[in-house]
Swiss-Prot record:
Protein name: Autoinducer 2 import ATP-binding protein LsrA
Quaternary structure, from the entry: The complex is composed of two ATP-binding proteins (LsrA), two transmembrane proteins (LsrC and LsrD) and a solute-binding protein (LsrB).
Subcellular location: Cell inner membrane
Originating gene: lsrA
Record organism: Escherichia coli (strain SMS-3-5 / SECEC)
Catalysed transformations (reactions): ATP + H2O + (2R,4S)-2-methyl-2,3,3,4-tetrahydroxytetrahydrofuran-[AI-2-binding protein]Side 1 = ADP + phosphate + (2R,4S)-2-methyl-2,3,3,4-tetrahydroxytetrahydrofuranSide 2 + [AI-2-binding protein]Side 1
Main location class: membrane
Length: 511
């Protein structure tokens, strides 16, 4: 961390950076600065624009407008190769190493001949205190050391600007401390680090400055020592939204009737000491007619839990009970037939067939139930019903899903899940990457679904979304749920965030 206020010219200045996707403004005139020898932490909720900004700086994505000043020169657009030449290196959350190659081969992979210096590599290893056996396979490294290999790859390219995307998401506290020791050694050489994270205690430990992004803008920026936790929490939290569907929309939304009806409050889904990839000993009950919020940080195990419930991942221990019957051994299709429906986090790669028609997508799960072949007239009528209920904007049923905006794609995905007649609907980040108007529509929709006594499990990293929508809330921390469900006044952004971040003051928030 910086120990002096005397700094040279900034390593990086991003000025008035704008970016739009499918008509949605993702970045709205961003200014961002990084100095030599400092860690500038970047926080924000999902969809705030952090990753987009960093991809622009790293040359992966072009900005629509704005400039990047690097080394005294202004650039409108970079490529990844050009960014590397300018000393910029992005270390992704999941290190992209070749496990079957040696550590040495991974570090030197892709370097220009003039950079292929074994002596330079050895000097960097010594400076950072790395005790690698360079001839060992990269696949034998733990996560923290894989992160360091990625960082070394950047330094071998003479990188002066390192962008670390959630570098501690998969690390234990001991691994995190080891990484921080090496980062501090690196800062002493004049390298600047952009540190993207959701973990406030770690940010306070390592960062000189903090910037908070919200809805494509910088909502807060300042020295770490001058910003309180409450300041940061308030900056992350978006504005409140409205709450209910119109009467006519509710009529159009009425779900298909071929599912068992449960009285509100009836336990529908029960998890007993569930253990799987990324989570352990998770127990909870989901009731008919409620929205149960599941909050937590990136890497807390929420998506892994959801995919295990749906049968996409292997269950290692515990029991899943649906309507009082164990479903551990059932396939995904069998769980779907029994009314367990999952809306995945990534609508484009996991949720929709982007090249298929809208009508086909909406009825895709019911095609699986009655045979693959579509019934065009019936499918078009089904799509029309959801268009009216969800205010989906499109030109014709035959158009491909990829032609819609992100918000309308998400509504098509929700319609697809609803047409499968869910008893339990698991929605993972349902408003990620959609604008405020579409978010409001989705919030209204989820309430109306719950009003039909569907049990809704809402997984979201948007804590205000959880506060606004959930009847009860569990917070996952490092793969576990170590508290009883939050209810009533305890469901607030401050309490949820303190539990999720592992903040030492979290108990005070519940008083």
């Amino acid at each position: 961390m910086q120990t002096s206020d005397t700094r040279a010219l900034p390593l990086l200045c991003a000025r008035s950076v704008y970016k739009q996707y499918s008509g949605v403004n993702v970045l709205k005139g961003i200014d961002f600065t990084l100095h030599q020898g400092e860690v500038h932490a970047l926080l924000g909720g999902n969809g705030a624009g952090k990753s987009t900004l960093m991809k622009i700086i790293a040359g992966i994505t072009p900005a629509d407008s704005g400039t990047l000043e690097i080394g005294g020169n202004n650039y409108v657009r970079l490529t990844p190769v050009h960014a590397h030449q300018l000393g910029i290196y992005l270390v992704p959350q999941e290190p992209l190493l070749f496990p079957s190659l040696s550590i040495k081969e991974n570090i030197l992979f892709g370097l220009a001949k003039k950079q292929l210096s074994i002596q330079k590599m050895n000097n960097l290893l010594a400076a950072l205190g790395c005790q690698f056996d360079l001839h060992s396979l990269a696949g034998s490294l733990d996560v923290a050391d894989r992160q360091m290999v990625e960082i070394l790859r950047g330094l071998m390219r003479d990188s002066r600007i390192l962008i670390l995307d959630e570098p501690t998401a998969s690390l234990t506290p001991a691994e995190t401390e080891r990484l921080f020791i090496r980062l501090r050694e690196l800062l002493a050489t004049g390298v600047g680090i952009v540190f993207i994270s959701h973990k406030l205690p770690e940010i306070r430990q390592i960062a000189d400055r903090i910037s908070v992004m919200r809805d494509g803008t910088i909502a807060l920026s300042g020295k770490t020592s001058e910003l309180s936790t409450d300041d940061i929490i308030q900056a992350i939290t978006p504005a409140l939204r409205e709450k209910s569907l119109s009467a006519s929309q509710k009529l159009w939304l009425e779900l298909p009737g071929n599912r068992p009806q449960h009285a509100a409050g009836t336990p529908v889904l029960t998890l007993e000491n569930l253990t799987g990839e990324g989570f352990r000993n998770v127990s909870l009950t989901l009731n008919a007619g409620e929205i149960l919020g599941l909050a937590g940080l990136v890497g807390a195990g929420r998506t892994e839990l959801a995919e295990t419930l749906y049968g996409l991942r292997t269950l290692r221990g515990g029991r899943i009970m649906l309507n009082g019957k164990e479903i551990n051994r059932l396939s995904t299709g069998e769980r779907l037939l029994r009314g367990l429906v999952y809306l995945p986090e990534d609508r484009q790669s996991s949720g929709l067939n982007l090249d298929a028609s809208l009508a086909w997508n909406v009825c895709a799960l019911t095609h699986n139930l009655r045979g693959f072949w579509a019934k065009t007239a019936k499918d078009n009528a089904t799509l029309e019903r959801y268009r009216r209920a969800l205010n989906i904007k499109f030109n014709q049923p035959e158009q491909a899903a990829r032609t819609l905006s992100g918000g309308n794609q998400q509504k098509i995905l929700i319609a697809k899940c609803l047409e499968a007649s869910p008893q339990v609907l698991i929605v993972d980040e349902p408003t990620r990457g959609v604008d405020v108007s579409a978010r409001n529509d989705i919030y209204q929709l989820l309430r109306s679904i719950a009003a039909q006594n569907v049990a809704v499990l809402l997984i979201s990293s948007d804590l205000e979304e959880i506060e606004l929508m959930a009847d009860r809330v569990y917070v996952m921390h490092q793969g576990e749920i170590a508290h009883s469900a939050l209810t009533g006044r305890d469901i607030n952004v401050e309490t949820i965030m303190r539990v999720a971040f592992g903040d030492s003051q979290r108990q005070e928030a519940s008083c």
